[in-house]
Amino acid sequence: MRKRVQTPKNKEFTMAFSLPPLPYEMNALEPHISSETLEFHYGKHHQTYVNNLNGLVEGTDNASKSLEEIITSSDGGLFNNAAQVWNHTFYWNCMGPNGGGNPTGSAADAINQAFGSFDNFKDQFSKSAATNFGSGWTWLVKNSSGGVEIQNTSNAGCPMTSGNKAVLTIDVWEHAYYVDKRNARPAYIESWWNLVNWDYVNSQLEG
């Protein structure tokens, strides 16, 4: 999404990227994730990545590229900010106020085939997220064989750079949970399961 803004010299230019709207209200994920967390995580952290990315692409050929094109063709600060914009947008869509419960449809079939049962998958995914060292993301991805697997990435890492398609993610950077859970990442992970938007997961598997 492009956004036109005024510079200090009153010259109009088009920002390459803007912060996508949340798919729900700031308080919609309570009591599992507070509105205060979203105000900081979405309103400040995610916005900062968007601002940084616009600063890096302004006046370059990258300003006309998609996030996916930048992510798969760059490194360093450009990659980090582009990937974090994409990762966070994907993360918000993976949750919803009417989420949680067991998967259905394509997600249930893929998870049962790969892990034997949803309980096995939930246990393995939770352990991977809890032990993902430092800052990063834990993903359920669709691999090149068409099956699903768990993938951990560090910092701004994104599955598309390894040829996998993201279908579900949890953000395990501390800013995702520190307001609500302090340093208790496992407690955040357990609460997060109540928010998983399985309809969105199905759409990613089938798309």
Predicted regions and their residues:
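Feature for soluble, non-membrane regions of globular proteins
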Residues: 10-207
